[in-house]
Amino acid sequence: MANIKSSEKDIRRTKRRNAANSQNRSRLRTQAKKILKAIKEKDPKAAMALFIEYTSFLDKAAKTNLIHSKNADRKKSRMAKRLNAVFAAA
């Protein structure tokens, strides 16, 4: 238990940030799943629209240090590879 006012405030701030970060991480995972579902259903338009949203959100997450920038780049690259592999053959 914190005894100092600034420590109490730090605890409140940490709870708020933790909630926001977990919500954003969950959103990242959900978006990735939606893209994979669109790929599985062979829907290129939906997959590309979702991919654009996903890359934008990854960039924002990297910018705010939710994930590392190289992690974001790797996720974008791997998802783009999957999209190209499925829809280039079609």
Swiss-Prot record:
Example of a GO cellular component annotation carried by this entry: small ribosomal subunit
GO biological process: translation
UniProt keyword annotations, A-Z: Ribonucleoprotein, Ribosomal protein, RNA-binding, rRNA-binding
An example Gene Ontology molecular-function term: small ribosomal subunit rRNA binding
Biased composition (Basic and acidic residues): 1-11
Residues covered by region (Disordered): 1-29
Transmembrane segments: none
A Pfam family recorded for this sequence: Ribosomal_S20p
InterPro entries: Ribosomal_bS20, Ribosomal_bS20_sf
PANTHER family on file: 30S RIBOSOMAL PROTEIN S20, SMALL RIBOSOMAL SUBUNIT PROTEIN BS20C
Function recorded in the entry: Binds directly to 16S ribosomal RNA.
UniProt family annotation: Belongs to the bacterial ribosomal protein bS20 family.
Protein name, per record: Small ribosomal subunit protein bS20
UniProt source species: Leptospira borgpetersenii serovar Hardjo-bovis (strain JB197)
Protein encoded by which gene: rpsT
